[in-house]
Structure formats: C-alpha cells, structure tokens
C-alpha cells in the first residue's frame, strides 16, 4: 500500500473488532502503509535451491528464507538495471515471482498430501499460475493437475507461466468452478480452492484494493465462496485433502466458509491442524487449526488458509455436460515410432513418458492419468505440443517445439549449444544467432545459457535460426549478465 492510500474507517473498525488480542490495530495500519517485500520461489523442476542460491549471490541478490516454503525467498536487489521479470533466471523458468503468503496454500496441501504418479489434483482458480506451478514442482511433473480458470482473459497468462516453468502434467479448463462437484464427483485426490475474495490482504501491493470495499460486497462474495467450497467438497475423493484459502481477512470469507461446510456435512469432514506447518505458525493459528495471517505478523500480505479432509464419501446428483467433439486422435504406431526415433537420433533422448496424441499435423503428449477424464471434460489446453509433422513420403519429418525443449531440454546432453549473455539476449529478442561456432551441428539444436536450456534453434550455414515463439519475444531492457 502507498502511504497516500486511505483505509476506509468502516474497514478499520471491522478489523479492530476481529483482531486477536495480542495484536494492535496501530501496527496493522502501519504495516499497510509499507511496501510489500518482493519474493520469489525457486522452480526445482529446473534447478536446485542450492544452485539457485549460488546464481543469486553472483547477481548480488540478497535472499532471505521464507519459513513456510523451502523453495521460497524474500529477495532484495542491490542494483536493479533491469526488471526482475526480465532476468535470465525468470525468463528461463528457474524462478517464479510470487508473494510469500501465496506460497502457503500449496505448502499446506503437501503437508498432508503425498502424491503418486497417478494422483489427480484440481487447482480450481489457477491463474496466473503461481500455485499451479508450485503444485507441479511438488509433484515432480508427474500425475495430473487440472488447472481451471473462469476468466478467459487470464488463461493465456496461465499457459505462458506453465510453459516457461517447463511443466508437462497440466490440463487447462475454462469453467465456473461450481460445476466440478456435479460434473466430476469423487474424482480428485486433492483440491486447492484459492477462492475469489474481497482482497483485503492485498492493500500493500494494490493501492486500489479498498476502493470498492463494503460489507454488502463481502456478503455477496461469501455467498459465491459457499457454492465453490460445496462443489470442491463433492469433487473430492474420500480421504482427499481440500485446501481453502483467500487473500482477505474478514471472517465471513474465511472461517465462516469452513464452518458452513462443516455444518452441511458434520460427519464427512475433519479440520486439519496447521500449527506444525512451520516454525511460528502458532502465531496465526486459530482455535480450529486454520491460519489467519495478519500482515504485521510475518511482514507479508494478509491471508487465510484452512486444510480440510473428506473423511467419508457422499452422493451428489450428476449434471448433464455438453462436451463437444474431442479434436485429438491416437497416431499410428509407425508415426509414433518415427517421432521417438527422431528425438533419439537428434537429441539422444528416449525417456519420454506419456500418451501421444495427434491433432492435424501437431503431436501432443498427455499425462497418463488424463485418460479417464478425456470423455468427462472439455479442455482449453491439454498436455504439451512436442512436435509438428511436415511434408510427405521421403520428404516428411518432424519439427520440435519450444514446449518440448522447456520440458525436456535440461535432461538432454546431446546437440546443445551454450550461448553467451549477449547471444542469449539476442535469442530472447527474437534474433538469429550469428558469430557462433556451430560446426558439427545439423538441423535442430538446443540453446542453453549458463547450463540451462532456454529454447530451440536450427543450425544453418552461417547462423542459428531462432525458433522462439513470437509471443515470447522481449524487445528490450533484458538481463545484463
């Protein structure tokens, strides 16, 4: 929050009434005047925390560990010649810029949930992708995540972040999350419902957060949240884990939503205690075991997290779905074999797991657990496009995709060229790479910077042709080293 931002007096009065006895409203108001500390989360699908810390130190970044997320750090940049979002670490998917409190729901989920290679997880309100990518890293890119987003304008950003982070176990859907309980009852091993809310905890980063604040709007939002948590509960398997979270502070949107569910199904749910989630979690623990994060306690956003276990199954009347035609088919065995032979000969990679599907000339890799859901949902995007087919007969072949190399590139040692900082900048700016020794390279080549693959090129006589998708090109103000 900026110091000029005014907190409505009605809001201050309300917060005074619900503030725990050990906290002071003056401290709450004061912390709301201070800028929010920036934070990042290391993407362990691409780099270890230890190796990232070394890179950060070389950059002059000061990292302070976030207690509830082993991969999370508050970050201070001593010099900032370029935005953090244009750093090589961010562009290459090695880290995700994410507020510290928003790392809590996923940490809470995996405090109680141990995934398998067949686990199916729903992120009910997924955009822009911070929690979806965090879940994927915790699942080590295995199993299946349904990343649902109701806002059509945010689906593109969600996909861009999933692609940048090298994630291959996500299927994207575009529905009102209230449909999942009737459409897919008892389906998910775990569900994250980071519910839409009034955003009372976000005033430190959004000076407009309180412009439309009112008790009537809170009541209206809470009604939607009740419907969302009911749907999530029905979609959850018996013994499944549901995490309910918001970035707001009012009880109507937090504790009261959990009590609403408990009152509806007193014999079917159990509140799980989050006191042992991290050191000092008890400072924000409620009597029920929820975490109600006041911003002055950890110098963070305001937040709420509850962990709920479904202890007993219950029935729900299924709804009629209109799915439309599924646009993919399984390729022939010959084509599948030809594709994998191409990858083996060009990149010496043979450990590609998943189900191969085809749409026109495109070849896609789907996560194995998706199979029973293919006829149950309409997907906005499913799996990753790994190649495109071209030509006919002897002149036919395959072209790899940017998605393929972001997901598999760091596990490939063959046919890889290391770029300098200047060459990596040129690549992100969409330019071809010249003045590079590419002798011995033919056709497609992986391009890496500081040991991590950042994209794909094609070796020609005097240059490497850039294959970066147009929508990912950055024109200026990129990293210096």
Swiss-Prot record:
One of the record's GO cellular component terms: cytoplasm
Record's keyword annotation contains RNA-binding: yes
UniProt-listed Gene3D superfamilies: 3.10.450.720, Vaccinia Virus protein VP39
Positions of S-adenosyl-L-methionine binding: 125-131, 149, 176, 194
PROSITE patterns referenced in this protein's UniProt entry, alphabetically: NOL1_NOP2_SUN (PS01153), SAM_MT_RSMB_NOP (PS51686)
Top class in the EC scheme: transferase
EC number(s) recorded for this UniProt protein: 2.1.1.178
Any Pfam family the entry gives: Methyltranf_PUA
GO molecular function: RNA binding; rRNA (cytosine-C5-)-methyltransferase activity
NCBIfam families named among the record's database cross-references: nop2p (TIGR00446), PRK11933.1 (NF008898)
Protein name according to UniProt: Ribosomal RNA small subunit methyltransferase F
Species: Psychromonas ingrahamii (strain DSM 17664 / CCUG 51855 / 37)
């Amino acid at each position: 929050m900026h110091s000029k931002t005014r907190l409505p007096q009605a809001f201050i009065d309300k917060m005074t009434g619900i503030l725990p006895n050990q906290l002071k409203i003056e401290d709450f108001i004061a912390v709301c005047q201070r800028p929010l500390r920036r934070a990042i989360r290391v993407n362990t699908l691409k780099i270890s925390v230890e190796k990232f810390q070394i890179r950060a130190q070389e950059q002059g970044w000061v990292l302070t560990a976030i207690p509830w997320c082993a991969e999370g750090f508050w970050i201070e940049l001593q010099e900032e010649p370029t935005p953090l979002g244009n750093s090589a670490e961010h562009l290459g998917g090695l880290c995700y810029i994410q507020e510290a409190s928003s790392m809590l729901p996923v940490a809470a989920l995996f405090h109680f949930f141990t995934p398998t290679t067949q686990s199916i997880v729903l992120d009910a309100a997924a955009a822009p992708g911070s929690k979806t990518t965090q879940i994927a890293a915790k699942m080590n890119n295995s199993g299946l995540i349904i990343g649902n987003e109701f806002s059509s304008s945010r689906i593109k950003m969600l996909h861009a972040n999933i692609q940048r982070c090298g994630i291959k176990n996500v299927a994207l859907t575009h529905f009102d999350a209230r449909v999942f309980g009737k459409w897919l009852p008892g389906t998910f091993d775990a569900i994250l419902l980071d519910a839409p809310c009034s955003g009372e905890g976000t005033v430190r980063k959004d000076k407009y957060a309180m412009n439309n604040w009112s008790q009537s709007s809170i009541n209206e939002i809470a009604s939607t949240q009740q419907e969302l948590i009911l749907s999530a509960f029905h979609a959850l398997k018996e013994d499944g884990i549901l995490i309910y979270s918001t970035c707001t502070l009012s009880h109507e949107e937090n504790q009261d939503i959990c009590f609403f569910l408990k009152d509806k199904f007193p014999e079917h749910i159990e509140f799980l205690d989050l006191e042992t989630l991290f050191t000092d979690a008890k400072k924000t623990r409620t009597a029920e075991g929820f975490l109600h994060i006041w911003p002055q306690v950890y110098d963070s956003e305001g937040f709420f997290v509850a962990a709920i276990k479904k202890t007993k199954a219950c029935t729900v009347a299924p709804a009629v779905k209109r799915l439309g035609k599924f646009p993919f088919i399984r390729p022939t065995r010959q084509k599948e074999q030809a594709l994998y032979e191409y990858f083996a000969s060009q990149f010496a990679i043979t450990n590609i797991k998943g189900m191969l599907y085809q749409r026109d000339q495109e070849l896609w890799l789907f996560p194995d657990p998706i199979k029973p859901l293919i006829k149950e949902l309409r997907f906005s995007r499913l799996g990753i496009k790994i190649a495109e087919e071209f030509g006919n007969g002897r002149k036919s072949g395959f072209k790899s995709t940017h998605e393929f190399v972001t997901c598999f590139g760091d596990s490939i040692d063959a046919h890889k060229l290391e770029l300098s900082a200047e060459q990596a900048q040129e690549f992100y700016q969409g330019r071809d790479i010249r003045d590079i020794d590419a002798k011995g390279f033919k056709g497609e080549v992986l391009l890496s910077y500081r040991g991590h693959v950042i994209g794909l090129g094609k070796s020609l006589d005097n240059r490497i042709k850039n294959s970066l998708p147009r929508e990912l090109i950055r024109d200026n103000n990129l990293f210096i080293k």
